[in-house]
């Protein structure tokens, strides 16, 4: 029933617009919250400029009805958010050249790319567990070439789970820049010798309850959020 209802909802432009707006809004709120937390922890008041800009973009988003324009606002906010990393990572020994996917142009991007690959798996498992079709989404293109719903719902978890985790391991010096090597084909990647350490740190983090996630562990939070999406935004929408 979930799959049939999912197809009906995703074919309805009005519902698709509502889901896209709500998802991007939550992503922008997550970006602001993480920057505010880091600003407080590391005493970096200059981050307030970035959080204020993202807040302004969020206000524009709430007046928008066109999904393509919403994606554009999401992109502007993402650039602002990642520009803040140069402030956060100053004097840490980690260089930041701006967000780059594949190939990763610096070592922090290598950590982000690796972390998001783990998040993709977590999100896909949560979606399959709710009997939704991971290929049918509302924000990313439904062209059959990738699991659109996985990438749509991942947007809810990047900042509060993966970015937070990566900032933690950098601050605690649990992984050093020396553990990341340059590869001709893929840019910067994690050295094989550190992957076991990464997995240990990641699994420990994913199972630990966090106050910022309503007292749930990150893994539990993902599953709960996707389950609620299936029930509230698909089965009972409209």
Feature annotation, model-predicted:
Residues 2-238:
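Active-site helix-to-loop segments that bind/position phosphate- or nucleotide-bearing substrates
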